[in-house]
Amino acid sequence: MKKVNLLLAAVVAASVSAPALADYTPNAYFNGYMRAGVGFDKNGKTNNTFQGCRKVGRLGYEDDMYGEIGLGADIAKVDDTVWTVNSMVQIDSDNANSWAGNDATPILRQFNVEVKGLLDSDKDAKIWVGKKYVQREDIHITDYYYYDISGTGFGIYDLSLGSGKFQASYVQHDNDNAENFSLFDVRYSFPLWDGASFQIGNVYSQGKKTKEEQDQLNGNMLTLELSQGFSGGWNKTVVQWKTGANNACAEGTPYNTSRDRDGNSYKIYNFGETTISGDLHMFHHADFEVADFDDSVNTKTTEWRVVVRPWYKLTKMTRIYTEFGAYGMTIKKDHKQDQNERIQKATIAYAITPDAGNFWSRPEIRFYATWLHGTDGNVTWTNGYRKGSTDITVGAQVEAWW
């Protein structure tokens, strides 16, 4: 925790010293996120994994402890220009004893400086430099980030252009496979008809040549998003096209990058929140993807998932959830047997939260029972279920943000 203490001290010191730099009383910010889960099945343990949450829904399918603690302060103001320091530490912990030295691992996720109001022509525009979550976009019920280039770099966002907003970022990345690359991201969002908006974004990924590898990894991801609000909720459709040897990196998840996996992928998502009737609501996520890679065995993959979470408000501070998820993937390779993966999940949960009529109300405590089934487990790297088995897990979860 020494790293956390040093970070807190640095931000506090910056805030305290700010009035000496400019005649300005700083505004301090404290925000964060946490979740924790525990449960057991017939064997006395949970099979829950991060990958499983992304595939069939996270309700009743998380057993880790994860947290993010953010601190920030507006440390100086000159006329209408405000200078802000932002920081965030991520903490992961397993179920080890708290007195074990390796129980919690702090990671620095954000540390950057933002300037708002520097441009006389657009006082809402913000310029940033440092390590930052760069306008991440996710689907909450599966914890799936479909647009995430977060890292160390610089950029500008909320820049007015016509009827919409423009942003541009440059981010550097290194991954565990010693692949070094740069991401160039531009996005433009603008309103359409009443309640609707459209965003177009493009990420170009450029690999770096090394003495050992002269081949340059380049890739591109184009993203189109249509958002529609209505009286009973909202809906979003996202279409993505990724191409090139580095197309996985363009999504901000470069951990499986390889220099011999040139190819293309096409993916469509639909997700949103709907009021069915009165106190009965539903959140859903559906997607479908096809990909082909020009590797030594001409790998082709097809992947799909459907997750629905209906929920009903019982009282002012209680509600009941159900969540149903199904996932499938098929991998085809020349001269090899097809690999198939199938997972199905059903969860029922009783939840306590300050405002049970608001899906996003937190903190929330949940008590759940989950049925989980996995078949066709030829894909040996898949965790979260035993091949051809059915498990029932019961447990509790908590989630909060502030």
Regions found by a protein language model. Name each.
Residues 2-122, 127, 159, 273-275, ...:
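Beta-barrel outer-membrane channel/assembly domains of diderm bacteria
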Residues 29, 66-68, 84, 108-110, ...:
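Extracellular structured ligand-interaction cores
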Residues 35-59, 99-109, 120-213, 382-387:
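Surface-exposed coil loops of outer-membrane beta-barrel proteins
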Residues 36-42, 75, 89-95, 131-135, ...:
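Transmembrane beta-strands of outer-membrane beta-barrel pores
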Residues 44-46, 141, 249-251, 296, ...:
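Outer-membrane beta-barrel and related beta-rich outer-membrane complex signature
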Residues 72, 114, 130, 157, ...:
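Residues in well-ordered beta-strands of folded domains
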Residues 116, 162, 229-231:
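Short strand-coil-strand connectors
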Residues 192-208, 213-334, 340-346, 352, ...:
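Detector for outer-membrane/organellar transmembrane beta-barrel domains
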